[in-house]
Amino acid sequence: MPCPRPFWLRHSRAPQGSGPSSPGSLSAPRSPSRGEDQEEEEEEEGDGSPGSGPILPPASPVECLICVSSFDGVFKLPKRLDCGHVFCLECLARLSLATAGGGNAVACPVCRAPTRLAPRRGLPALPTQSGLLPRDARAPPSRQGSVRFDRRRGLLYLRPPPPPPGPRKARAPPPPPPLRLGRPLSRRLSLASPAWVFNAAVALAVLVAAGLVVSGVYIFFLIPHATSSGPPRPQLVALAPAPGFSWFPPRPPPGSPWAPAWTPRPTGPDLDTALPGTAEDALEPEAGPEDPAEAERTLDRRSDGTWGTEAGPGWAPWPRGARRLWGSQ
């Protein structure tokens, strides 16, 4: 069904040949081909599109210009905007949900003029044209209740009036169910909008504050509690050296002869006194050689006293199978 055009946008066209012709038209006759072209152009301008159907009659003043529905006293209340156009409350609510923003204003769908809304009351606070309502819907607002619009949930609902004082004579009819209109148009954050900078700053501040709180709880509460309630741990004690202790040998007094820090190995007869128990540890020869040939080889060595002298002081030949002995021979 094509949408009807408002009556103020339509311009009537006088039928040809119905009225008296001007004198100029009698003196200048038109050619038949030119007259047909002008008639086709006028038809296209009047209809808005070539080949369209017949012009619909103007909308009734008791119908909404958007949904072409009759006004009533519930959700089809006639609401007047600041520009003077009248629409039903349901259509204005759907228009508000389809418009990005906080719902603080609504634009007229005909002239695009904005209308400011009350901060907390919204669309139901617009003036109502009671003269466009049918007679059965012209009840006082105190009896029929108030219509509310929840833009966040997209609901139109009727709030029932308070019960009248006095005895209850008859039950009031139940209110109509709420009308769901859909969700409002969500704002998509993009890099071009300045809102994302504020949101990012708030998120960063929240993260930093949460990190500081967690760190403070861990440092000032968890660590002291763990150290106080846990088993005693061994502590390291620094052992200081005794007073007067020195890591270096004492220096000799001046004028004393120099003595080396090491002592030479004792040689000669002092060895037995310097190393006690050496004679006990020395192994005696097990037994003499039983083979006479082997004994001769052993005796071939120099048996005079100069052999040990040439070899060095304190050196003596040692028999086979015995340990070396230090001392004078």
From Swiss-Prot:
Query: Which key words are in the record?
Result: Membrane, Metal-binding, Transmembrane, Transmembrane helix, Zinc, Zinc-finger
ZnF region ranges: RING-type:
64-112
Q: Where is the composition biased (Acidic residues)?
A: 37-47, 281-293
Q: Which PROSITE patterns match?
A: ZF_RING_1, ZF_RING_2
Where are stretches of biased composition, namely Basic and acidic residues?
294-304
One of this protein's GO BP terms? protein ubiquitination
Per the record, its GO cellular-component terms are: membrane
Query: What GO MF terms are annotated?
Result: ubiquitin protein ligase activity; zinc ion binding
Record-annotated membrane-spanning stretches: 203-223
Q: Which SMART domains match?
A: RING
Q: Where in the cell is it found?
A: Membrane
Which Pfam families does the annotation name?
A: zf-RING_UBOX
Ranges for the region named Disordered are 1-55, 122-181, 248-329
The organism's superkingdom is given as Eukaryota
Bias-annotated ranges (Pro residues):
159-179
Q: Which InterPro entries match?
A: RING_finger_E3_ubiq-ligases, Znf-RING_euk, Znf_RING, Znf_RING/FYVE/PHD, Znf_RING_CS
Q: Where is the composition biased (Low complexity)?
A: 14-32
Provide the topology term for how it sits in the membrane: Single-pass membrane protein
| PANTHER family found in the cross-reference section | RING FINGER PROTEIN 225, RING-TYPE DOMAIN-CONTAINING PROTEIN
What is the protein's name according to its record? Answer: RING finger protein 225
Provenance organism: Homo sapiens
Which classification does the entry list for the species? Eukaryota, Metazoa, Chordata, Craniata, Vertebrata
Name of the gene encoding the protein in the UniProt record? RNF225
